[in-house]
């Protein structure tokens, strides 16, 4: 499994902000660390998020809800999820409007983490 580390997420966020606008920078390093480590947590020797889909959903929701960045939290949550899934063999096929709706829904609480997992499954065109 290929993971995204903190420096890679910071780079993706910076690049995304340059291309789409907004304020660059991290508001809280601890919240970023939490969002990046959560998908890989275990308890009693069992992974809390055992599948690639659940890890991707947790990464996305953590980056959006933790408010680690000054701006672009919805964009980086979605972007990081897509990159993570692609690096690990999943190909997500969807429209820009669907991505926007997903990010807004997660941020507002209308879409929960389990729903993100379902979204990933229904939009996966990879192997």
Model-predicted segments: where are they?
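FIC/Doc superfamily catalytic core
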Residues: 1-127
């Amino acid at each position: 499994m290929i993971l995204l580390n903190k420096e890679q997420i910071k780079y993706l966020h910076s690049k995304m902000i340059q291309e789409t606008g907004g304020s660059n920078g991290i508001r809280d390093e601890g919240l970023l660390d939490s969002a990046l480590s959560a998908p890989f947590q275990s308890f009693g020797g069992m992974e809390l998020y055992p599948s690639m889909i659940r890890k991707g959903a947790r990464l996305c929701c953590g980056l959006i809800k933790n408010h680690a960045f000054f701006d672009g939290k919805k964009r980086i949550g979605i972007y990081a999820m897509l990159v993570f899934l692609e690096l690990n063999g999943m190909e997500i096929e969807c429209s820009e409007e669907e991505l926007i709706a997903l990010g807004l829904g997660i941020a507002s609480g209308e879409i929960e983490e389990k729903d993100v997992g379902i979204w990933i499954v229904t939009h996966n065109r990879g192997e």
